[in-house]
């Protein structure tokens, strides 16, 4: 960890030096631009009586120099934008390594209380696991990462391939930071893939064959007219008339062009900004299969994706010139600019529209690997779990910890082998660590399914669908009580098991909404049914009677506990998992200490 922190701090210092260098060049170029204006104005003033050849040439040279310097100035400003983005990226890494989540995106729109596990494991929201792991550079990558968290591919071969890709991307630190920085420079606009797919089926919006022919004939017409004018065969008024005629023709199409431009900007503007990201993907050399396959999808017989997306960006930028009134008049009067660009965009879409969805899929998948590669790099002591297919075990780990708990506060525990059709029952006092332990298992199991490293010394697991029941809530909108909401989740588990699914189940204090006897009877019956259906999992409870199942279901149910120690007036927790059934409870002790009940209260009072 210290090595990683030193690396980021070193990069931050180097980036600061580069920022200062770029600022210096920007100031120099600004001074040169001003100097060109001042010198040109001075020469014009001093030689104003020398004839139009002298001061006219000076003005022309001054304009060329000024515009050239403006282009150079713009490039340096883009470089500064890039290094500023890189500065923010590195600062974000340092903040997250120190578990500071202020201002970090939590993906709140992905929160779904009905999902199999995401709500229980706090995957999304403020200070969530998504905040911790998300390093995506694009809006489409961000959505793809949420899909990976919610619906990971559980095929063993796929997980192993993802592990290879994550490991390889963890070695490309410069690439990852630059990729994220260019993504940050491209903006956060959402790429509407559904709208893009609809573009493929929309009618062509080109201007027709006659107007298209006219667009390409206009430059030749003007050249001929200018040549005739220079020889005195045509009056200048003819050229002016043609200019006005073409301007009127452009005006007739202006409303249609504006409508098409707005539609294309909504659907394609974000994609056009990603040309540099595609270029980075295409130029890198990859060893592992997943990254190589993604890269191969960026090139075909028609050229590379980056070239075609760059062409799109160029066309959209050209069309934006129409918003300048002078530019609109000159460009359309001489070149029928709007119609020329609309026809070019129509041809571009005709050639590429059906491929855009594939490009976005490639970019989003690659972005997820960059994100997980950063996670791997940031935590070099995390390990890739071993994957089993025979469910022996479904889950086992040594020194398993919760990645969202800082290292100095984290207490790691071993997880005994959980084989098929077996359950571990965790008993313990309030605040002893049961719920945190369940979430620790859930988060690391999910990381393993995603192909990411886990917070453990070692871990072995069989990828199965994960289902949790750690929290439930009343729903006034659905006229649903807490207890009924919990029953519905338990019903989902049972129905899926009856359909033959194999699940990894994590439950916390089931049937909390009923009386003790009813709860105990229902809990015992549920665990027997889950074991009988071949499910595997872990259940935390305060009900010590559930521990007796280990006697009636030997080899199928095992007991573990978190203990609280009461020494005099102090309550302490070790947060260490131990075999057996809990012996100490702390509710009355805490109620006495907080003055809720009398300090001399006892059950005999």
Feature roles, as predicted:
Residues 70, 372, 379-605:
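ATPase nucleotide-binding head domains, primarily ABC-like/P-loop NTPase cores
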Residues 1-429, 436-466, 488-489:
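Alpha-helical coupling/stalk and coiled-coil linker elements that connect catalytic or binding modules
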